[in-house]
């Protein structure tokens, strides 16, 4: 059984201008004292076509963590616009929150993000080069995709079964309009569970 349960993630400052920081209020519970840190990350998927455009916006270590319920606000700067392909700047993408313990990812929470112009003229006739100052980011907070992975919480050298800690299925969270190209996002994995918070 997992020693950490994520109870809630609240998306703050949503919708917001593209350049605003991402803010998530994360509530989790530890079933027992954890002697080592939890590592939380926020990852922005810059393009569904290649992982090379994924940006780790921030990473924070929390711990050691005593048993009980905990809450913190995780804030990360907006992605570096120069690292996003111009063709992927407007439209739907994904932001991921991951958590690892002893180097093993045990939960991945994904949200669809829609980047669009608020100005009607720009929406109907978008500029060839994205105008990030005019883009609004809207996170679909009501429908997160959650994937849980079985990990070895004790940190022993014994190996977990291969099917219990594998990457999610390819393209499981790509919007229907995207063509398959990589497997950056969430999906169902045997012996793991995926649900909504």
Swiss-Prot record:
It comes from the Eukaryota. Keywords: Chaperone, Chromatin regulator, Nucleus, Transcription, Transcription regulation. It is found in: Nucleus. The keyword Hydrolase does not apply. InterPro entries: ASF1-like, ASF1-like_sf. One of its GO terms (molecular function) is histone binding. Its main location: nucleus. GO terms for cellular component: chromatin; nucleus. GO terms for biological process: DNA replication-dependent chromatin assembly. The keyword Transcription regulation applies. Belongs to the ASF1 family. Histone chaperone that facilitates histone deposition and histone exchange and removal during nucleosome assembly and disassembly. Interacts with histone H3 and histone H4. This is Histone chaperone asf1b-A. It comes from Danio rerio.
């Amino acid at each position: 059984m997992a020693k950490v349960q994520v109870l809630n993630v609240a998306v703050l400052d949503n919708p917001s201008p593209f350049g605003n920081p991402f803010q998530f209020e994360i509530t989790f519970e530890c079933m027992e004292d954890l002697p080592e840190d939890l590592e939380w990350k926020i990852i922005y998927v810059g393009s569904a076509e290649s992982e090379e455009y994924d940006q780790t916006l921030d990473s924070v270590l929390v711990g050691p963590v005593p048993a009980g319920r905990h809450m913190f606000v995780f804030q990360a700067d907006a992605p570096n616009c120069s690292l996003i392909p111009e063709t992927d700047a407007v439209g739907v993408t994904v932001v991921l929150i991951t958590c690892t313990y002893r180097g093993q990812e045990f939960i991945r929470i994904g949200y669809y993000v829609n980047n669009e112009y608020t100005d009607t003229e720009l929406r109907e006739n978008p500029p060839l080069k994205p105008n990030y100052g005019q883009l609004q980011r809207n996170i679909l907070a009501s429908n997160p995709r959650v994937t849980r992975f079985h990990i070895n919480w004790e940190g022993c050298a014994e190996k977990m079964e291969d099917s219990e800690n594998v990457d999610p299925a390819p393209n499981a969270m790509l919007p229907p309009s995207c063509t398959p190209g990589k497997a950056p996002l969430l999906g169902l994995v045997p012996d793991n569970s995926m649900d909504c918070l």
